[in-house]
């Protein structure tokens, strides 16, 4: 299964965000690029939250998503948030995955409203990854608010749980992108490009991304 994006266009007033954008997504992929270039807008279009001005897409089947806002149920604890949207996910699996991502047993009992930003982000990531009937994953900056060790753990969990499902993961974190081991693309104008040997062997592209990250 693939996500096929053909000639998408989107404007907000006088600003063009996407122009004649096309991309064939086969399996898990990372999308990078400068802030404001249209990465989040692209995901919102694929989720049906924005309407494109032109173009079409196909292959987004029963998507699960990580948004820039975590959108947890504030009165529920982390386990219950996962079970609520897991479509048959059992509490034992939810608890196991949360503990593996650095939660202490006592923290599993806290309502989401009392969790830190990084903890909420980990719950949001697992909520998408553990949704049992999701066939497509659209993940917008899922590692925000995590330290280096938690990012490493989150990357391992993401790779394990995504499998080969069509996935677009947006990130400014070049190190995390490389750790994932997926195809890395850079959103530039109307294309999603990648150097022949990936960003790790393209110093100019890597430097651009690091500048973007440091400027945030």
What does each model-identified segment do?
Residues 75-93:
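Q-loop/switch helix immediately C-terminal to the Walker
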Residues 187-216:
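Conserved beta-strand-loop-alpha-helix hinge in the C-terminal portion
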Residues 123-130:
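ABC ATPase nucleotide-binding domain "signature" region
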Residues 47:
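Helix-to-loop junction immediately C-terminal to a conserved catalytic motif
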Residues 140, 147:
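ABC-family nucleotide-binding domains
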């Amino acid at each position: 299964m693939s996500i096929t994006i053909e000639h998408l266009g989107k404007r907000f007033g006088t600003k063009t965000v996407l122009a004649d954008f096309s991309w064939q997504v086969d399996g898990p992929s990372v999308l990078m690029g400068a802030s404001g270039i249209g990465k989040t807008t692209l995901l919102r279009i694929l989720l049906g939250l924005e309407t494109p001005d032109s173009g079409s897409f196909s292959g987004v089947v029963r998507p699960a998503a990580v948004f820039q806002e975590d959108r947890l149920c504030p009165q529920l604890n982390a386990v219950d948030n996962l079970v609520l949207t897991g479509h048959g996910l059992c509490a034992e699996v939810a608890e196991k995955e949360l503990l593996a991502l650095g939660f202490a047993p006592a923290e599993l009992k806290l309502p989401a409203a009392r969790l830190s930003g990084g903890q909420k982000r980990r719950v949001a990531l697992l909520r998408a990854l553990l949704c049992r009937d999701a066939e497509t994953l659209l993940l917008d900056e899922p590692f925000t608010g995590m330290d280096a060790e938690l990012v490493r753990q989150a990357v391992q969990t993401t790779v394990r749980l995504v499998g080969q499902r069509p996935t677009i993961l947006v990130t400014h974190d070049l190190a995390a992108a490389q750790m994932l081991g997926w195809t890395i693309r850079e959103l530039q104008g109307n294309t999603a490009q990648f150097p022949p040997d990936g960003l790790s062997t393209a110093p100019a592209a890597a430097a651009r991304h690091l500048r973007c990250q440091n400027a945030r």
